Amino acid sequence: MTITFSAVILAGGQARRMGGVDKGLQLFRNQPLFEHIYQRLQPQIADVAINANRNQQRYAQSGLPVFSDDLAGFQGPLSGILTALQRAQSNFVLFVPCDCPFFPMDLFAKLKHAVISQHAQLAYAHDGEREHPTFCLVSTSLAPALAQYLATGERRMLTFMQQQHAIAVDFSATPDAFKNINNLVDLQT
């Protein structure tokens, strides 16, 4: 059986630390943040979509498929992940947040190797010091378990991942690759 993969850029948050603006559309080095993410994703995986809960028309101008969370009220990244898993035509979905334009060019390859070699359903990035759970590769078969988890009111990504025996994949050689842009000052760097 051939295992298939797709990717989703997570741009569905409220961006409270950035004053509530749509973070994925903020210009960084003369381009919206989500476009930087797509440019790094595209060489790694061909099938890419965007999870956005506002400004869908603007995101759709990129030519990429755009979808919003099925759960209303900005319930966090797991809500977008659940919606993506339920809609995916692939066996696994790679997730990348819209605010980390320097993520590793081997992100998909390393996460894919981890899930295949260890027969896992979920793998996420770890930089040697911190977990980066929004950089993850998730089996679509986990959608029912995630729906149950969210129905309890829980929203913590790492708790869900630990319950699913997720694999932390070592990216300690490139810890700065996971630096995210959290405020308007960061956009100027």
Curated annotation (Swiss-Prot):
BP term (GO), one: bis(molybdopterin guanine dinucleotide)molybdenum biosynthetic process
EC number: 2.7.7.77
Protein localization: Cytoplasm
InterPro entries xref list: MobA-like_NTP_Trfase (IPR025877), Molybde_CF_guanTrfase (IPR013482), Nucleotide-diphossugar_trans (IPR029044)
Homology family: Belongs to the MobA family.
Subunit structure, as described in the record: Monomer.
Name under which the protein is recorded: Molybdenum cofactor guanylyltransferase
Species of provenance: Pasteurella multocida (strain Pm70)
